[in-house]
Amino acid sequence: MHNRPEFPKRAVVTAGMPYGNKGLHFGHIAGVFVPADVYARFLRDRIGAGNVLFVSGTDCFGSPINEGYRKLVEAGDFDGTIADYVQMNHDAQKAALDAYDISLDIFEGSGIGLSGVKQQEMTDAFITRLYDNGWLEKLSTPQFYDAQAGTFLNGRQVIGRCPVQGCKSEKAYADECDLGHQYDPVDLIAPKSAITGQTPEMREVSNWYFELPRFHDLIAAHIEQVAGMCGTRRVLVDEVESFLAPPIIYIQEKFADDFSAIEAELPPHSVLPAEKGKSSFGVEFASIAERERAVEVMHAHGLRFRTGKTLVPFRLTGNIEWGVKAPDLDGTLPDATVWCWPESLWAPIAFSQAALEESGRDATDWRAWWCSDDARVYQFIGQDNIYFYGVAQTALWQGTQTGHEPHVDGTGDELRQTTLVPNYHILFMGKKASSSGAIKPPMAAELLDHYTPEQLRAHWISLGLGVKPASFSPKVLDPNANEKAPDPVLKESALLANIFNRI
């Protein structure tokens, strides 16, 4: 006989954080919010509505917002502040979520409402704890600078090609591509400024970094435990394990002679022959620092290469003025702000605090939801974000533990590892669509001109995105649709209506 499922006494359900540079497209709703909403409703039925917090909010900061705001202002289409711009998009996002009957306990933002206040407090405490525990280092690294515009460039203000071996992303930005791969800015291939279209310079900038490579063994131990748990999705395990590979540089075999000519200048390494069917051999190093020294040598000699996935220091701060203010840890970076990705990882804690306080409970009780063995946090995410939640967040949570060497999971009043629920891509007409890509997704509000929320919710849940990518192909938006063919979007709701009519 199978064991009956066990449920926590309290549960938090999170549904990611859409950037505050636009309304919600169908992928936001179908890929994350609807699955999270279904599970939150299920948990309320199992353990009681008062024991479930379903939280989310607008990601108010980051280069996509700066870029979107800049373009609108330059085009003369917006004359408010950047805060006004974010609030406008937040309001549109909330309206769409309400229209789809997403039953959130709170939807504010990392810079909006009480959640924004809590987020600044949480950011100060979180980063200070990591610093006090000895897990931060200040690094001076090259950053893109647009001399024509007279400004440093971050994130999506730079566009190029991903340097990670085998990556098939459509676009790559300053230090990450649209498939979530992380790399050093200097490795980005063919960078161009999104502001002027010019090739940017590289200038040294100091920032705080979390020493992610030091947590390799703890991350590996955690994902091994997760892999053995019932319900774990294979895409989570595969993606996390791919980042645990050693530091490797890949070089096409046609450049083997050029490599041999400079090999003596490289730090200690091992040469790995090209795998069957591959055109590149590998050069493996013992540490990320040694690989970076090798990268400098190869750049100096003009040798072409690509880097493999591995753990690299995780940047916490930046120099974008519009951002959550970073604590001034040693008096040297008083104007630093926090990169949007790390602060978005602990933002759901701030949302939980705000939700508790706004419902008449005590915000300080958040630890009973995030730091307790009888509670669990379920985080619904897209597969492109597994690196941030499954790799970086795992280690950040471990890095906040105090009084002992870090453990795989927290004890006492320490943060517990969360349960990640990643979904595969939801395609549009069989192709990947994104707001920044060639194929634009339909907006969530637009679809309600053709379907009811119930019809869309039933269809999206039926796609099984936890198992495989699936296509959303609404007949009303398909120019090649057969007039006589049924609309695939209506199949599930028609079936349910037929069943209910027979009862």
Report the location of each language-model feature.
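A glycine-rich helix N-cap at a beta->alpha junction
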Residues: M88-D105
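P-loop/Walker A NTP-binding region and its immediately flanking N-terminal helices
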Residues: L130
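Conserved short loop/turn motifs at secondary-structure junctions
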Residues: Y69, I106-Q120, G382
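A charged helix-plus-loop insertion that forms the helical arch/lid used to bind
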Residues: G68-M88
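Short, well-structured secondary-structure segments
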Residues: G50-Y69, D105, Y389
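Structured secondary-structure scaffolds
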Residues: H2-A49, L53-S56, E121, K192-I503
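Cys/His-rich short segments
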Residues: N133-R214
